[in-house]
């Protein structure tokens, strides 16, 4: 009897151990793969870098902003976060246009720009009053508007993106450079563009070299200029170098001494940037900023060249939603109709 009792005890012990092993395996099998699966599903999202794109939406040209956003979103698989900047009286309209159109799927934030930061920094100028609009200076204040990003893309509203914006975002900024721009002398079609009457591509076209403050900079007037309508910016360097403060200093000096004006090349927003960033910026692939499409309504690019371009910019007076203008078919293909019916195309005289 004693032997039988011991055998039963051993069998019972083995049964308990077996049950424990089975239970452990079942629990382990049910949990570990789930964690692995979670890791596999979450890792791509965690590793996918968010690309912040800053673009302004002015009341009278909001359709331009929406077309630009549509072209960017439609030509990339990247994770884009649009920062749409406007004045207080336009914020509701911006949101309604996005949420009640094909753009409703985009990831976006609406940012209010307070024009009071410009008080005393803009000299009244009647030659091109549109260049004095507050949103034209948003690019000066990027770190104050965008906080959690190391690298940011800024775009003017009168652009269309035909390439993958990821390529532009991947632009390499040299050590110590706060921004990258496209040089005006590096355009692939420079010979054709330079035939446009009044086009400037040097500092002489932007700064008044008769003024002592400009002469004292020691910058040759024949130095190639750049266009700040497309910017890839490093926010850490921007803040470290106090770029915004430097720009404001030259804005105030212009109010006092009239160092530049919109009657010259790029007007009041480009000139201070040319001064502050002189010799301290990286370059963007020229195909990522094909510009001057709004300079002359009679000047046209070849179709082949336009197809090669990654980004088209209608800088100048002749906008593609208005008349007269050129290559407006390329712009209109990305146009998002205004749900409120306020913004309308004007392609006829």
Curated annotation (Swiss-Prot):
The protein's Enzyme Commission number: 2.4.1.-
Parts of the chain that traverse the membrane: 7-24
Topology feature Lumenal, residues: 25-349
Keyword Glycoprotein: yes
SUPFAM superfamilies attached to this UniProt entry: Nucleotide-diphospho-sugar transferases
Disulphides: none
Name this protein carries in UniProt: Glycosyltransferase 8 domain-containing protein 2
Gene: GLT8D2
